[in-house]
């Protein structure tokens, strides 16, 4: 039997201004964390005679979205890190994100990481979530067979 639990997911953002845990225990919203590539790895071209040609795209850029409850103290840590990095261009885009499901073995290694923008923040009847998005220069995934 295979079992999944967000409790087994660890994610760390490290860079100028600190190191912040963004996985289980950081006040995540139900949407959790999403890793997404910007481009397809392949482009299929069909020639005039119908011959197919596959072209491998070497790009590995992507986006990571971390959803935190409005009341998560982690929002304050991310806000401070964002402001610290934005104050000096030498600090911008020098982060690393490391994610792992410690039971199943899935891993994501993300380098050349920058905050995409400060999150939108809605004040309403329900607290909702803040979505922190990060642009990733190089994302290396490895899905495991464990668990």
Regions found by a protein language model. Give the residues of each.
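Solvent-exposed edge beta-strands and adjacent loop segments
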Residues: 1-73, 111-133, 141
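Short, conserved charged micro-motifs
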Residues: 73-79
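Short, acidic/charged, Gly/Pro-enriched secondary-structure junctions
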Residues: 79-108
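Flexible glycine-/small-residue-rich
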Residues: 136
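Short acidic DE-rich linear segments
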Residues: 143-147
């Amino acid at each position: 039997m295979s079992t999944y639990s967000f409790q087994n997911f660890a994610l760390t953002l490290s860079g100028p201004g600190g190191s912040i845990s963004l996985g289980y225990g950081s006040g995540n919203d139900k949407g959790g964390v999403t890793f997404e590539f910007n481009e397809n790895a392949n482009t299929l071209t069909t020639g005039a005679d119908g011959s197919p040609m596959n072209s491998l795209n070497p790009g590995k850029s992507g986006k990571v979205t971390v959803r935190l409850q409005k009341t998560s103290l982690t929002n304050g840590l991310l806000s401070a890190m964002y402001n610290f990095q934005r104050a000096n261009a030498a600090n911008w885009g020098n982060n690393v994100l490391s994610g792992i499901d410690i039971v199943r073995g899935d891993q994501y290694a993300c380098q050349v990481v920058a905050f995409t923008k400060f999150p939108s923040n809605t004040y309403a009847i329900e607290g909702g979530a803040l979505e922190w998005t990060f642009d990733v220069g190089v994302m290396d995934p490895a899905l495991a067979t464990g668990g």
